[in-house]
Curated annotation (Swiss-Prot):
Alphabetical list of NCBIfam families matching this protein: S16
Disulphide linkage map: none
Species for this entry: Ehrlichia ruminantium (strain Welgevonden)
SUPFAM superfamilies with a match to the protein in the record: Ribosomal protein S16
Keywords: Ribonucleoprotein, Ribosomal protein
Protein name (database record): Small ribosomal subunit protein bS16
Family recorded in the similarity comment: Belongs to the bacterial ribosomal protein bS16 family.
Underlying gene: rpsP
InterPro entries registered for this protein in UniProt: Ribosomal_bS16 (IPR000307), Ribosomal_bS16_CS (IPR020592), Ribosomal_bS16_dom_sf (IPR023803)
GO CC terms of this entry: cytoplasm; small ribosomal subunit
Coiled coil: none
GO biological process, one term: translation
An annotated Gene Ontology molecular function: structural constituent of ribosome
Length: 87
């Protein structure tokens, strides 16, 4: 079983809203997930406090046990939008 940290799409047509989830890679994009880590709203400006919220401690846990982040989640981490540094 390959576990991925990825975005699951919600919201209305042309008004996307994403949940950051941990899911088995074989499950559909918006299907069953193991754990909800946070959310991402691309319709808001980056400075808005609700633009991207993630439970950092749980993200660190899943990365430590081998979960693979998708390209977009990796991009968030590299850009510093999700901090994985020790607090």
């Amino acid at each position: 079983m390959s576990v991925k940290i990825r975005l699951a799409r919600f919201g209305a047509k042309k008004r996307p809203f994403y949940r950051v989830v941990v899911a088995d890679s074989r499950v559909a994009r918006d299907g069953r997930f193991i754990e909800l880590l946070g959310f991402y709203n691309p319709m808001l400006p980056k400075e808005h406090p609700s633009f991207l919220k993630v439970k950092v401690d749980r993200l660190k846990y899943w990365l430590s046990v081998g979960a693979q982040p998708t390209e977009r989640i990796s991009w968030f981490i590299k850009k510093g939008l999700i901090s994985t540094e020790a607090a």
